[in-house]
């Protein structure tokens, strides 16, 4: 059987505000990321784990004021409520021209968010060169 060797270097990692990764594979993706884009409140989790997001994207309803004040140059505010923060972060990566993506933290916590994020994955896949959604399981 042939082993598939994934190369995570140079990819953009979008971190949603679900369960923060704790296993080696997703954490390796974060370490090797070209860019780390936090979906709103996921910035809290990244910072709590000593990881600085390059960008924080969303409607900012889950982002503490202290982070807004500390990192204003990293924040991309999108007020529209027709899409979730993961979709907003995905659009942001498209505007930047980043087309090799890894999505972390898109499952757990809320079942409705998990199902919505999984449903959007096929839509995203049509617009980029490569995309992976990785969990701890």
Predicted regions and their residues:
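N-terminal beta-strand-loop-alpha-helix module at the start
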Residues: 1-70
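General beta-strand structural signal in soluble alpha/beta enzymes
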Residues: 15, 37-40, 58, 77, ...
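Alpha-helix C-terminal capping segments
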Residues: 47-51, 94-95, 125-126
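Short phosphate-binding loop-to-helix
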Residues: 72-96
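Short Gly/Thr/Asp-enriched flexible loops that form oxyanion-binding sites at enzyme active sites
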Residues: 112-122
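Class I SAM-dependent methyltransferase SAM-binding "motif I" and its flanking Rossmann-like core
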Residues: 122-137
